[in-house]
Amino acid sequence: MPHNQQIKKTVVVFSGGQDSTTCLIQALTQYDQVYCITFDYGQRHRAEICIARRLTITLGAYDHQIIDTSALNVLAASSLTRENIIVPLAEKNHMNSSLSTFVPGRNIVFLTLAAIYAYQVKAEVIITGVCETDFSGYPDCREKFIQALNKAVNLGMAYNIHFISPLMWLNKAETWALADYYQKLDLVCNETLTCYNGIQGKGCGFCTSCSLRARGLETYKQQPKLTMSSLKAKTGLP
């Protein structure tokens, strides 16, 4: 790299799940230094923290911070933070399921802390794997929320940070195609943790998260060329 060329840096909000791992894989091809930030909020599927740590090493992130946000567990009752609240089955209505698994304020906290981290390391981009195409039950996964918080953070910190959500308008099949585009399909399939019940890889097979993941993979395997073509049309990938 020429001496006078600016180093491109980004912070990836990283859980070790399918979506954030796919975002990390892509970011590593686009930035010189990729910083990851993971949050420990007492989630019942907290095995994801160990998986996130391992994946950042395997994939080659520049740095990885694990931040204690246990206040979320105290304040936000959810089936993801309370053992006495049952994780709903995928057969239930998706919108009703989202009410149980929604952790109020989670992405507000995560993205704000990621912005502070970005400020410290002088990164101007934050990447988050939120998506509202397949499952729009969470209000803090909507594009208009991401844009609004981005504006508020920039005003509050007097620092120009750009929140990017590369998966926002991709369906799950296209997200699998993106992992395959970077030749990491097997890694994402076997080494990530998306399951609400904390089971790596294919997961429990019963929760909404596992169902969406499995259906997306099945669709991609049935129509790989069509799905890859759709991905490229949406993203501009060559």
Curated annotation (Swiss-Prot):
Entry's EC annotation: 6.3.4.20
Zinc is among the record's keywords: yes
Gene field: queC
One BP term from GO: queuosine biosynthetic process
The protein, known as: 7-cyano-7-deazaguanine synthase
UniProt binding sites for Zn(2+): 195, 204, 207, 210
UniProt lineage: Bacteria, Pseudomonadati, Pseudomonadota, Gammaproteobacteria, Candidatus Palibaumannia
Function: Catalyzes the ATP-dependent conversion of 7-carboxy-7-deazaguanine (CDG) to 7-cyano-7-deazaguanine (preQ(0)).
Alphabetically ordered keywords of this record: ATP-binding, Ligase, Metal-binding, Nucleotide-binding, Queuosine biosynthesis, Zinc
Protein's organism: Baumannia cicadellinicola subsp. Homalodisca coagulata
Family to which this protein belongs: Belongs to the QueC family.
Annotated residues for binding of ATP: 14-24
Note accompanying the cofactor annotation: Binds 1 zinc ion per subunit.
